[in-house]
From Swiss-Prot:
The keyword rRNA processing does not apply. GO terms for cellular component: cytosol. Keywords: Decarboxylase, Lyase, Magnesium, Metal-binding, Thiamine pyrophosphate. This is Pyruvate decarboxylase 1. Its cofactor is a metal cation; thiamine diphosphate. The gene is PDC1. It catalyses: a 2-oxocarboxylate + H(+) = an aldehyde + CO2.
Amino acid sequence: MELALVGNPSNGVAKPSCNSVGSLPVVSSNAVINPPVTSAAGATLGRHLARRLVQIGATDVFAVPGDFNLTLLDYLIAEPGLKLIGCCNELNAGYAADGYARARGVGACAVTFTVGGLSVLNAIAGAYSENLPVICIVGGPNSNDYGTNRILHHTIGLPDFSQELRCFQTITCYQAVINNLDDAHEQIDTAIATALRESKPVYISVGCNLAGLSHPTFSREPVPLFISPRLSNKANLEYAVEAAADFLNKAVKPVMVGGPKIRVAKAKKAFAGIAESSGYPFAVMPSAKGLVPEHHPRFIGTYWGAVSTTFCAEIVESADAYLFAGPIFNDYSSVGYSLLLKREKAVIVQPDRVVVGNGPAFGCILMTEFLDALAKRLDRNTTAYDNYRRIFIPDREPPNGQPDEPLRVNILFKHIKEMLSGDTAVIAETGDSWFNCQKLRLPEGCGYEFQMQYGSIGWSVGATLGYAQAAKDKRVISCIGDGSFQMTAQDVSTMLRCGQKSIIFLINNGGYTIEVEIHDGPYNVIKNWDYTGLIDAIHNSDGNCWTKKVRTEEELIEAIATATGAKKDCLCFIEIIVHKDDTSKELLEWGSRVSAANSRPPNPQ
């Protein structure tokens, strides 16, 4: 059984039939570089790679030019249906490909050898940790220079050119170094297929003298890319379903919790289906927010140990059985390893494996097939949800601010909550925005993304650029702290070049707040910027941009009304001035527990 890419061969645009997220972007961006007048329409390596990107749905490539990749970029530009988006630096190009992959299912970036590759490395590591298929394309040295004793620029001064490759080997699932044409077709197709199958980044290095060359293996209209999907072992699937159904049907008050690997398994629909049929209350791990239907009446919130949604942890941890779909238990998601869970009560469902309690483990099982089959075998049980209903008390809204009273963070997020709809998506930066955005109840169709496993501050600027470019049917609302913004601010200019209309809330509290709550020190204080002034300078009267500095609730209400009204077609940048100690109670609790975990003394030797 094979999975073919589907689409319109006449225009070259196609994407995996299983990829239903996002929509293909319209070819209308000021950031797109016009194709040069060239005869590059033949069956060349560059054209083959460009066509493959279009076929899989990566119709935007985030790039930084360098002398080793310039010819390759010419072929990317020349490909109909493919846009080349120039970024301010390689790190943001990688972050943009990460955000794009979250909305579209796959992303791509293109940089130059070593100086570009090592700069994008951090972003690719983040994509690897978050299980995102990103095609990282590097323009490499001239193929004639491999195996010689020549020393090239953009290297560390050694004749061995493999340093960059070795760096990428641990953060990509496949590496292709193309320095001859004979196996270029095979290497490109294998790399792309592996990225889609494994849901991890891949590395493709193309010799700078090869992109414009033809070879018999390349065809003017490439043969469609076929990916053989993984299949469940039918016997194992039946045994696993029987064991899990017996385990859960014996429980008095079972619950379900969705984890981040639901995305990898493409099991959002299957999870929603079993949640509906089983009658169980269900929660979401913090890193999986946006992957389960929060508009469902039996959704009980975020399960995050001591900083869970009110009454959620009580129901989950008091259950006598719980089904976790795609969980990742790290020090952050477990709040310093403090979750009150028992392994013998859990059914752990990973993308290709099921473990039932302390008992049997079953491999070669797809999560989607397992959840669909299990849903038909579970007895309906609403006991845990009935218990939740008995103890539930709605959270109180924060009191309105007084006239001219300094704005509080909880007031800000009260108003952000009212902005959400199926036509919006939330990007939450590492920091206190993690905790405040977790409290937002997402309406049906509302997107949500953040980077919990890797937690690289500054990620959200590039991710906002990429997500907005991939999901043009949504308006992105980004919540970014001032410390994070200082890392990657310059690619707001790329958002303007692309004509994006995101709303960025820059929360200015004068420092690295999340680090303050883990371990305070003078290094957590940063130089304050005039952030709206910076964006005005970047805008420079070129593009649609509106900025506002806000200090009170009245000013916030007015700014949001303008951003969603008169300036709805603009990139809106709203700087929120708050007190340096204004943090969520969840961050205070989480920070103290993570600090305790970090400061554990060495085990006795």
